[in-house]
Amino acid sequence: MSNFQAVYFRGKDGAQPVRDFIDGLDPKRRAALLRQIDRLNGLSDAVPHLPHPYSSQISGELRELRCHMGSDHYRILYRRSDRLIVLLHAFPKTTGKVPPGEIKIAEGRWEDFKGRMEARPRKPPRAAGHDAP
């Protein structure tokens, strides 16, 4: 079976908040986050999750992708949908635990994604996080 495919969540308005967050970083930090996302593209049924310290479970099927650059810590919250890994929310981490507000944003985007996929199934998006409904 083929590898999973990481895609950016795309809002109803066409916005891609995770991509926008990454694009707003300096080149070194952007490259580090993109390397972590590329690790997700290597996952498959045989290896469905990245090990700690790259990733960890947040709640239910919601997971966090971790990235450290010196004293800066970044998180991308994501969830799987069949063969897709949907990148839902990205933020700089400044506390010990992922704040509930950040989790709520990711869960809201997941419900939006899931609702639109069920309402109108589409062809899978392009690889490496180009787009998702």
Predicted features along the sequence, with ranges:
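Basic, Lys/Arg-enriched alpha-helical interface segments
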Residues: M1-H73, D82-I85, P92-P133
